[in-house]
C-alpha cells in the first residue's frame, strides 16, 4: 500500500527511493508489527478475558499447569492482525506470493479460531474433531500446493533440493510437487501447534525460523546472491522477507505478554496459522529440508508424539512420561522456564546450522 505511494512520491523526492529496498521495508514491517502488538496487546487480552476465553487444561497434564486455568487464549489473533496490517502497509501487493502466504495464514487461522472456540464454549480440551481439522487443513494445503505448481514460472520453482549438495536437484512433476507442498504446510502447521504447550515455547522458535527464512527468501529472489550461493533463483520470492519480518516483530510483541508466567496463550488460531506460513514459505523458496533442520524443535516435538502413540499401541508401554516431549521433561522435575529456555537454545543452534547451509554447497 505505502510502497505504491512511495513510488509516486519518488518522482518528487528521491529519498522515497528507500522504499524500493527490501531490507528497509523489512525493518519497517518488523517494527510496525512489534509496536502494534505492544500497543494493542493489553486491549486484546482484556477483551479475551471478558469473553471468558480461558484455555482448558488437560486433566492428565503436569500438576503445575492447573494454575494456568482461566488464562485467556486465542492470543494468536493479535499476531495475525498485526502481521496482516504490517504486510499490507509495507509489502508489494502486486506479488502473488504475498497474497498466497496471507491467504494460507488466514485460512489456517480460521481453523484454529474454530478449534479454540469449541474448547472455550464446550470446555473441551480436545477442541475440533481431528478428522474435520485435518480435512480442512488438507483442503487449504492442497490448494496452496496446486497454486504454486500452476503459477511456477521457472523450473527451479518446482525442483526439490537437498541442502549442502548443489548437484542434487530433483524435478517434481504434478502430484509429487503438490504432495510435498501439502506435507510441509500441513505438517508444520500441526508441529508448531504441538509445540505450543508452555509459555513462550513455540513463539520464539517461530520468530527465529521466520528470520532465517527471510534470509533465504531475500537471497532466492536476488539474481546475484542466488548465483553466488548456488541456491534456486525464484523471481519474486524476495518480497517474502516482508512477511518474515512482520512475523518476527509480531512474535516478539506477543512474547512480551506470553513469557512465563503467561498473560495470554497463543491458541490454535496462532499456532496452526504460523506453522502453515513457515511451511508455505519454505516450499516457495525451495528450502523444505532446511526447514526440517531449522524447525528441528517442532520436528522433535511431533516425533515424540508419533513415537509415544505407536509404542503404546504396539507394546502397551510409553517411551516418554508424557508427550509432547516438553511435558516429559516437566515430569522429570525440570521447572517450566528451564524447559522453555533450553528449547530456545536448541532452536538457535539449529537455525544457525540451517543458515550455514547457504555456504556449504
Curated annotation (Swiss-Prot):
InterPro entries: Glycosyl_transferase_4, PNAcMuramoyl-5peptid_Trfase, PNAcMuramoyl-5peptid_Trfase_CS. The chain crosses the membrane at residues 25-45, 73-93, 98-118, 139-159, 168-188, 200-220, 237-257, 264-284, 289-309, 339-359. The keyword Transmembrane helix applies. It is a multi-pass membrane protein. Pathway: Cell wall biogenesis; peptidoglycan biosynthesis. PROSITE patterns: MRAY_1, MRAY_2. Its main location: membrane. Its cofactor is Mg(2+). One of its GO terms (molecular function) is phospho-N-acetylmuramoyl-pentapeptide-transferase activity. Keywords: Cell cycle, Cell division, Cell inner membrane, Cell membrane, Cell shape, Cell wall biogenesis/degradation, Magnesium, Membrane, Metal-binding, Peptidoglycan synthesis, Transferase, Transmembrane, Transmembrane helix. It is found in: Cell inner membrane. Belongs to the glycosyltransferase 4 family. MraY subfamily. This is Phospho-N-acetylmuramoyl-pentapeptide-transferase. It comes from Xanthomonas oryzae pv. oryzae (strain KACC10331 / KXO85). The gene is mraY.
Amino acid at each position: 500500500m505505502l510502497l505504491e505511494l512511495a513510488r509516486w512520491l519518488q518522482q518528487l523526492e528521491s529519498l522515497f527511493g528507500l522504499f524500493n529496498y527490501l531490507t528497509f521495508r523489512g525493518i519497517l514491517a518488523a517494527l510496525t508489527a512489534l509496536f502494534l502488538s505492544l500497543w494493542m496487546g493489553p486491549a486484546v487480552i482484556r477483551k479475551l478475558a471478558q469473553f471468558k476465553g480461558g484455555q482448558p487444561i488437560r486433566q492428565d497434564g503436569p500438576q503445575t499447569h492447573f494454575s494456568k486455568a482461566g488464562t485467556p487464549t486465542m492470543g494468536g489473533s493479535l499476531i495475525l492482525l498485526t502481521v496482516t496490517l504490517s504486510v499490507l502497509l509495507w509489502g508489494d501487493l502486486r506479488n502473488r506470493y504475498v497474497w498466497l502466504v496471507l491467504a494460507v495464514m488466514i485460512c489456517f487461522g480460521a481453523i484454529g479460531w474454530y478449534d479454540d472456540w469449541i474448547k472455550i464454549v464446550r470446555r473441551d480440551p480436545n477442541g475440533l474433531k481431528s478428522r474435520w481439522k485435518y480435512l480442512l487443513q488438507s483442503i487449504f494445503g492442497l490448494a496452496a500446493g496446486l497454486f504454486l505448481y500452476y503459477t511456477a514460472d521457472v523450473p527451479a520453482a518446482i525442483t526439490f533440493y537437498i541442502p549442502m549438495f548443489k548437484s542434487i536437484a530433483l524435478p517434481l512433476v504434478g502430484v509429487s510437487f503438490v504432495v510435498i507442498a501439502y506435507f510441509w504446510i500441513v505438517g508444520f502447521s500441526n508441529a508448531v501447534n504441538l509445540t505450543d504447550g508452555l509459555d513462550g515455547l513455540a513463539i520464539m522458535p517461530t520468530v527465529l525460523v521466520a528470520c532465517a527464512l527471510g534470509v533465504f527468501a531475500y537471497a532466492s529472489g536476488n539474481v546475484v546472491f542466488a548465483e553466488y550461493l548456488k541456491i534456486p533463483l525464484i523471481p519474486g520470492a524476495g518480497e517474502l522477507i516482508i512477511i518474515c519480518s512482520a512475523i518476527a516483530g509480531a512474535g516478539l510483541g506477543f512474547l512480551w505478554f506470553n513469557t512465563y508466567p503467561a498473560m495470554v496463550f497463543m491458541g490454535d488460531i496462532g499456532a496452526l496459522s504460523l506453522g502453515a506460513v513457515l511451511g508455505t514459505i519454505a516450499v516457495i523458496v525451495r528450502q523444505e529440508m532446511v526447514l526440517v533442520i531449522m524447525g528441528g524443535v517442532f520436528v522433535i516435538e511431533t516425533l515424540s508424539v508419533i513415537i509415544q502413540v505407536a509404542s503404546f499401541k504396539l507394546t502397551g508401554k510409553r517411551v516418554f512420561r508424557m508427550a509432547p516431549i516438553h511435558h516429559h521433561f516437566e515430569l522429570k522435575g525440570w521447572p517450566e522456564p528451564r524447559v522453555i529456555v533450553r528449547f530456545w537454545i536448541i532452536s538457535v543452534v539449529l537455525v544457525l546450522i540451517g543458515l550455514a547451509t547457504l555456504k556449504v554447497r
